[in-house]
């Protein structure tokens, strides 16, 4: 059997972490087994759906490196791939269910249903539809139609039936049909509900495995009943765990960024996010946590997907992203850094080839101190400012501040005499400052760092000074002496 899986987002907003993980797991499963991955759009919520959100979702998938073999924008033999373009298909199949006695029209008002729900809950029973319109006579139907009531279409759930799901993640799960109630498959505006449309789409598109979030498990018995009523073969199911915040509550905006677009805008790298998402509920075994997409694809199986909820740990994501930042090419990182530096006011003019080469030196140093690219603006001020302002109070926080004038004077003299400043020549000059002043260790480094950078901590001086350049280094030393 050739594996066919799908990702079917609703375009009512950006692609969120949970949706991205579902898409990734489906993609990995297809690629691991040499199958096909399909993307379609579930846009029957017409008030909230938009083409802008659809484009955002598709762009987020592409950015993560998730491609698809069939579906929206790609085409294929099983389209259309938007639900709003498939309405006639659902309506025809709904009619067939009515004709076969598997569905019926319901004229109950919201008020009547609310009273019914409340009565069931007071008795400690699950709220469900009790079938008031199950066996309406033609006269009652005609009366309701004459009153202008628009019916919904309900599926007639068989009584006393055990519905068994052999789930790849959850194992065997059973539901009793008596606890489900006759559910709506077509709304009063003749638009299909999720449970009906998803069955029709999965069947028409030849989906063999449905890999989705655990929250859909309760929908599965309803969908299985529709498959059986239409005489269709059911796909296999795998319901992956929920994603929780570090406080073990369901992940939400209060836990930080929740959409892929937000992480993209903050300057996370797609390979880091994919690595992180893959580990939200899946593990290949062992202690290793850093994997390329190719490695994950080769190892991914559903039997390694955990039942327990996955915890979204932003510290772990930051650690992973920091690792990938330090592995990435400086050229790539510099291009990513430019918009953040422009936004912070560090880059105002057009960037020349010479300036870009200098920026690469800045980024090569700063990347060692950041978890995502937006943070780079917090670590580059020392390279861009013309002058360093040091108050006497700041100077007094430095070990050996009394010797600061001596160190500044010796440094100015030795840096002035240097032909060029490289990491090696700066190391030699700092050593020479020690010999000339008779000072050692922190009594040289701290005054020198504060004098040149205005900071007490940061990258090694032999890395910073060549990038600042001779002219600005001397100017800062002169300012410090004053």
Swiss-Prot record:
- Kindly state which keywords UniProt assigns to this record, in alphabetical order: Aminoacyl-tRNA synthetase, ATP-binding, Cytoplasm, Ligase, Nucleotide-binding, Protein biosynthesis
Q: Motif 'KMSKS' region: where?
A: 250-254
Q: Does the keyword Ligase apply?
A: yes
- What is this enzyme's EC? 6.1.1.17
Q: Describe the task this protein carries out.
A: Catalyzes the attachment of glutamate to tRNA(Glu) in a two-step reaction: glutamate is first activated by ATP to form Glu-AMP and then transferred to the acceptor end of tRNA(Glu).
**Protein name per UniProt:** Glutamate--tRNA ligase
Where does the protein end up?
Cytoplasm
Provide a GO biological process annotation.
glutamyl-tRNA aminoacylation
Which family does the similarity line name? Belongs to the class-I aminoacyl-tRNA synthetase family. Glutamate--tRNA ligase type 1 subfamily.
Species annotation: Desulforamulus reducens (strain ATCC BAA-1160 / DSM 100696 / MI-1) (Desulfotomaculum reducens)
Could you say which residues bind ATP here? 253
What is annotated about its quaternary structure and interactions? Monomer.
Q: Which domain of life is it from?
A: Bacteria
- Supply the PANTHER family for this chain: GLUTAMATE--TRNA LIGASE, GLUTAMATE--TRNA LIGASE, MITOCHONDRIAL-RELATED
